[in-house]
């Protein structure tokens, strides 16, 4: 356990150094830039929303999850090519580095900052007020939180997009798209054979029932229903609620050969008065095909040790 923490700490330090160097190169005018976030100007032109400015790492050494150097596909001044038609396959990560996908204080386009909140119904507001989250402007002490994930319950969906969205492998098969997530080694199956949703779902699922379609050669739209909610799953780290009536739409838009934008819209008539957008054009970059990610799992025994050694003392709880 101690060794694992040392490895993660070393990786975080290395990642910080890499992106700090990228920032210095950007200030000195080195390297091209793609702009996919709210505000700021990039040399690549164009503006989007919700993801922040994309930092160029074209001339930096690329490391995989184990610190192994890889061949950087954009090294030596190479520029991204056009988006391949109807293809979002590959290994993707947040374009501004793994930390951009953590989203501890809420989804990137609706953070919990005390200034704005989603459009709750009375039932949604009551559910939200009953949640004691570890993050956000109403954060509580560790051992006082009632977040289901504190017991290593599955994050569920769409929270999988709103917390620890790190390296993501997308595999396109004949009749389905499979998405593999680094955090908790989760996977989702999205049917692409033209089927509709079942007339009746026998059971709701942690990650729901998903069907996908191409709306144009660069945009893949996924709709998901049949989700577990009602206090077993939260929408995000800050305690926003979701019910089993939630519907989710994801739009994966391939900007070019090496950049993709993810937009997520949620609709839940039980807890929200209208649909809203937690993630708007969140930029993700394509990684090297031989990128080997490091394992990240929530182990109940580790969570128990954390509570005993750190969470309880920090919360003033004596056992």
Locate predicted features.
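Bacterial N-terminal signal peptides that target proteins for export
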Residues: 1-8
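PEST-like low-complexity, intrinsically disordered acidic/proline/serine-rich tracts
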Residues: 19-319
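N-terminal signal peptide c-region/cleavage motif recognized by signal peptidases
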Residues: 15-17
């Amino acid at each position: 356990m101690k060794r694992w923490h040392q490895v993660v700490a070393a990786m975080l330090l290395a990642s910080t150094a890499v992106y700090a160097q990228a920032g210095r190169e950007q200030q000195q005018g080195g390297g091209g830039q793609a702009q996919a976030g709210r505000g700021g100007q990039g040399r690549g032109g164009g503006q989007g929303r919700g993801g922040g400015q994309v930092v160029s790492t074209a001339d930096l050494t690329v490391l995989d999850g184990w610190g192994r150097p890889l061949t950087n596909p954009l090294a030596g001044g190479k520029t991204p090519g056009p988006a391949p038609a109807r293809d979002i396959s590959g290994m993707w990560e947040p374009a501004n580095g793994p930390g951009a996908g953590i989203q501890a204080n809420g989804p990137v386009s609706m953070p919990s900052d005390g200034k704005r909140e989603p459009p709750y119904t009375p039932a949604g507001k009551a559910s939200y007020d009953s949640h004691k989250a570890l993050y956000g402007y109403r954060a509580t002490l560790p051992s006082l939180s009632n977040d289901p994930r504190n017991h290593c319950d599955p994050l569920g969906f769409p929270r999988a997009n709103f917390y620890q969205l790190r390296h993501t492998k997308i595999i396109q098969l004949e009749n389905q798209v499979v998405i593999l997530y680094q955090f908790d080694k989760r996977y989702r199956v999205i049917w692409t054979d033209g089927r509709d949703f079942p007339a009746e779902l026998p059971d709701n699922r942690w990650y729901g029932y998903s069907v996908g379609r191409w709306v144009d050669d660069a945009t893949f739209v996924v709709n998901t229903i049949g989700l577990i909610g009602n206090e077993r799953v939260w929408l995000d780290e800050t305690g926003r609620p979701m019910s089993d009536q939630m519907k989710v739409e994801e739009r994966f838009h391939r900007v070019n050969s090496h950049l993709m934008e993810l937009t997520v819209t949620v609709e839940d008539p039980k807890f929200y008065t209208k649909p809203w957008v937690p993630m708007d054009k969140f930029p993700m970059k394509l990684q090297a095909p031989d990128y080997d990610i490091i394992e990240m799992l929530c182990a109940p025994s580790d969570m128990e040790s954390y509570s005993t050694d750190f969470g309880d003392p920090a919360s003033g709880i004596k056992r």
